[in-house]
């Protein structure tokens, strides 16, 4: 069993294959979060902030970036900033609720993602203190390092769209994410949307909560991992079913 990066996950799988040892890999990816026209901008923003910035963005199922309907983009950004101030105050560096980055190496990686980006909010960091301010970025192209690699930190890129053909094109750039989310007041559409793409697990009108349900299996698919665990699935993952029969003589 391994939890970590795709790069190391491949190494683990290669080494396990030498011994024909089965593995469960819980990896990651760029988890998209689509914001259609939700019933409540306030609740949507609150749930995005919680899911994205918990543990300073260092969770494998955090929304990596938002794909937002142009009609509500400005309202949503304004409310996300408001919810950030409510969660971590206007000075997150002084908030006991706001975390720190795991290492100086990761700080250097995150700071490199900001190069040549349009910062809408935040962007300040202190490598020595391992502090990285909650940051919102407006995305106009997908060629940057920020939009090619998993972030795993408190940087939230926002991409706008006008129609779902654009959303489809964007999502297909990032195959097999570990998680996918959509906020919409049309639940039937939300279900149909999530059923259209391969990913590990997700939610409609929330983020990350699926990991807390011990009746749901948790795991990735393709580049985001293989195998599953949680609840009954954990016993199955760490067990070998050894069938046999007994017949009378």
What is the role of each PLM region?
Residues 1:
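N-terminal Rossmann-like NAD(P) cofactor-binding module of classical short-chain dehydrogenase/reductase
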Residues 4-142, 204:
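ALDH superfamily catalytic-core signature
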Residues 34, 131-249:
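Conserved C-terminal structural/oligomerization subdomain of aldehyde/semialdehyde dehydrogenase
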